[in-house]
């Protein structure tokens, strides 16, 4: 089956550590992503709110969570679920008030839980007062806050999305995603001489935009927020090959913010850790876009964590190790369970057994784990839902949290037809209440994994990772985690077939099972022989 010393294409990295400016608590961090409109409703309007998050902080503390990321909660027309902001300085009334958010920070901190907000840095809503002012033909303070071409009927030969004929201003604006998300102007990396509308990054307009972004960050940090997940962080400077100027822009922002808030946590939606960590972010995600590899885990037809598949994990491991070697002590990488843009793990026929294997991997892998709300109980991706607030095919991953077997699964006291989205219609849908009392549940499995991770430095964000098995077409995966003298062997078999694993080439002083299912292991001299049933996992302390 191979020796760990022969894995030339799966090289070990000896140590990953957070940089000197990164908060040390990130080494033990387990994040929980909250889609606020679907989490918990306290006022009976069918939409989750900030007070609902406060109400459930004790649950998150019980689970072992020590940081939360809240999707956009600012004033918005909600054409894209809040990723179209109208006012960066005010909480959307449907979620509550600014005072509610300040209270959330205080209550979370009392439970040793950090709070990170979602910062949409690259664009605003089309209804934002800045954009309305920018649309005016007469020049004003906001004329250059967005990117406008020189003529509404010109065909600019550049790879950007132009929206024409929207306003009386005789020019087109650039949109980032949907037409109603006009791109903020941070300048162009190399403005074309023949395109006078392409402003350099140090022009007055782009500099004012940058200053406003820092002002927004300062406002929320001064009220107790611990950091931000930055939406599309790579997209700010336009026509920027390799994102070189965007990296410089973020380096400038991070340096200035750190003067006032040295412990701020910055998480990027970038998908290329080598670039984002260089830009000054503490964490970057392995994503469904960006560098290839993440989809090999759960999302593709031949993903590794699919029971009836011939997928292997080698491509993901190779990519992860390459990126980890490049960022080294400067930052961390996250492999999320899912997010609001992709299918949940509980999709495509996966069962609780399958999900337990997935979480065993996610919570023993280096970097910072992010759990999408409801994944810890195996909430299902609901196919075929009508699009809500620009969700389209993503809508099925945004349904209300399932707390108990009461009305609306304990999410809201509103009428069924008033709920933000329909609930999972299954009679046996999972709930936190049922699973909390079942020691064999997915929820208690996740809780036990988090507890083991927290008390075991070798299983946390930094330290040694040595892949032992999983190359070629293996349907199992084995790896070693180590910190100082503490060592753990993790073995996974997500397939339907049983498997035999033989580990050689490592010193064995002990073989103590920690969290295991369907595994039988024995020591034979300097070797470990492990039998893995289908859909099984094992964590052994060596």
What are these regions (language model features)?
Residues 125-135, 270-301, 380-392:
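Substrate-binding cleft/loops of secretory-pathway carbohydrate-active enzymes
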Residues 498-518:
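Beta-strand-rich binding/interaction modules
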Residues 216-239, 335-339:
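Active-site groove signature of glycoside hydrolases
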Residues 13, 26, 258-260, 280, ...:
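Loop/helix patches that line or flank the sugar-binding groove of alpha-linked glycan CAZymes
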Residues 315, 320-340:
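Aromatic-lined glycan-binding groove of carbohydrate-active enzymes
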Residues 524-542:
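C-terminal beta-strand-rich structural cap/linker in extracellular carbohydrate-active enzymes
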Residues 2-211, 222, 233-280, 401:
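Acidic/aromatic-lined carbohydrate-recognition and catalytic surfaces
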Residues 66-67, 112-114, 217, 226-229, ...:
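Beta-sheet entry/capping signal
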